[in-house]
UniProtKB/Swiss-Prot annotation:
It catalyses: L-cysteine + L-glutamate + ATP = gamma-L-glutamyl-L-cysteine + ADP + phosphate + H(+). Its EC number is 6.3.2.2. GO terms for biological process: glutathione biosynthetic process. This is Glutamate--cysteine ligase. GO terms for molecular function: ATP binding; glutamate-cysteine ligase activity; metal ion binding. Signal peptide: none annotated. GO terms for cellular component: cytosol. It comes from the Bacteria.
Length: 481
């Protein structure tokens, strides 16, 4: 949008207006594998006590039959979301018999590839589509990669705040056009600066040896296409913050030809549709049917829009007969889904209230900051900074790329620039807040920028080293807590 950070700060400068910045709808989806008391992936069916996967809006499965997904409804505050997620988490824990919820994003001890159970669905048209889609994911990427779990954080600003900006800035567009452009503007800045969330909240610096085959395969690919990169990336076992969001976790390298730049809804729709309609030599060679059974939906770059992996996605509640993409095109962006958060093992529900408060400050900052279009060159730097923060974030000498020129900047210095504005936003949001919870969340996270010891990724490695514990032993201690 065509506004500046100082202009937006002035616009929300009084207490009544600033209170709107913390209002909206918020929700969390948490994925977690079920494990037995030895730390092995549970191979049992999804517990029947949770009912039909299609019918239960709070507890379902993700890729695997062993992978539970807990979903809160949209609520009005971080505190309400936390309570709702805690209630669901307790319900699941109490229902599990001889099993626990794995507290980490990277998988527990995995069986052989063929023994990992894909989620099972009823023999209905919708059920068959979901089943074939998941079988296709297993065929394309391997089941082990699909066993990674995370936190999806959903949010939207309040109608009151959106109306206020629309009126005050006298936007010469329809309300719907303005809302779409507002969320796309925020998203472009989120992409530019989300590396700092990977650094601060990354909690998957290590994995079990049963996942190593995925890492070795990716390292081989890197050595072939980028030999000079391989040496640096091999240091991931010393410096990683989040294997989950790195090349060793979810990756969209096969989709690069149709990179989505998030510059408009039309471009977003066109690029994703193109990937859904363009045949992939790699995937089509795998076949669509095997022994008379359909093994993937199609041989295209994307089987469906759900396969589009991105740090952030646009969402709309769908009506009968709609897909997520057609709902967006028909009625516009309703809310945003942040997808780069690792499960926090140091909080019983996988994400803390403080994290959610910080995310709200960060999202407002991304909204306020000027947001020009992203081009191919800038997207390349965005993706590079993402990978550097994920694989080498704990290297105190790490340099990131700036976006306005070809220069590089120390991670800490780049972070200081961001936190300078986050403090201003948090102070504004705390004007009518006695607790000063937004400023406190910013100061708490700022300490991590200059003290690696405070990072969750570093804490995981330190606790494992100090107590000479394996990855599985560490995970089981927090699973049983």
């Amino acid at each position: 949008m065509h506004w500046s950070f100082p202009e937006m700060i002035r616009l929300f400068s009084d207490e009544y207006r600033s209170s709107m910045l913390s209002e909206g709808n918020f929700g969390v989806e948490r994925e977690s594998q079920r494990v037995n008391y030895s730390g092995d992936l549970a191979l049992t069916p999804h517990p029947s006590v949770f009912g039909d996967k299609f019918e239960n809006p709070r507890i379902t499965t993700d890729f695997s039959e062993s992978q539970i997904e807990m979903i809160t409804p949209p609520l009005k505050s971080a505190e309400e979301v936390y309570k709702a997620l805690n209630d669901i988490n307790n319900e699941v824990k109490n229902a599990l018999k001889g099993e626990l919820l794995w507290p980490l994003s990277m998988p527990p001890r995995l069986p052989k590839e063929e023994d990992i159970p894909v989620a099972q669905f009823p023999d209905t048209e919708d059920g068959r589509q979901k089943q074939i889609y998941r079988n296709g994911l297993a065929l394309r990427y391997g089941k082990k990669m699909q066993m990674i779990s995370g936190i999806h954080y959903n949010f939207s600003f309040s109608d009151k705040m959106i109306d206020f900006i629309y009126r005050q800035l006298r936007i010469e567009k329809t309300k719907r056009q303005f809302i779409d452009e507002m969320y796309f503007s925020l998203t472009r800045n989120f992409l530019r600066y989300h590396w700092i969330l990977i650094y601060l909240f990354g909690a998957s610096p290590i994995c079990d040896s049963t996942y190593n085959s995925v890492i070795f395969k990716e390292l081989e690919k890197i050595e072939k296409c980028c030999p000079h990169c391989a040496g640096k990336i091999k240091n991931f076992n010393r410096y990683a913050t989040s294997l989950r969001v790195s090349r060793f976790g979810y990756s969209d390298t096969d989709e690069k030809k149709y990179t989505v730049y998030f510059n408009s809804l039309r471009e977003y729709e066109t690029k994703i549709k193109k990937m859904m309609e363009t045949e992939s030599n790699k995937y089509s060679k795998l076949g669509i049917y095997k022994d008379g059974v359909q093994i993937q939906l199609n041989g295209n770059l994307l089987q469906s829009e759900s396969e589009f992996y991105a740090p952030i996605r646009f969402k709309r509640n769908i009506k009968k007969g709609e897909t997520q993409l057609t709902a967006l095109v028909n009625r516009g962006v309703e809310y945003i889904e942040i997808r780069i958060l690792d499960v926090n093992p140091f909080d019983k529900v996988g994400i803390s209230v403080e994290q959610m408060n910080f995310l709200q400050v960060f999202n407002v900052f991304c909204l306020f900051e000027e947001s020009k279009s992203i081009d191919e060159e800038q997207m390349e730097r965005i993706n590079t900074n993402h990978q550097l923060a994920a694989l080498l974030g704990r290297n105190e000498d790490l340099m990131l790329y700036k976006y306005n020129d070809d220069s590089r900047i120390p991670l800490k210095n780049f972070g200081d620039e961001i936190f300078e504005k986050l403090r201003i936003v948090a102070k504004l949001m705390d004007k009518d807040n006695v607790e000063k919870k937004y400023s406190e969340s910013v100061e708490s996270e700022y300490k991590k920028l200059h003290n690696i010891e405070l990072l969750p990724s570093e804490r995981i490695c330190r606790e494992m080293d100090n107590d000479n514990r394996s990855y599985i032993q560490f995970g089981m201690e927090y699973a049983e807590a």
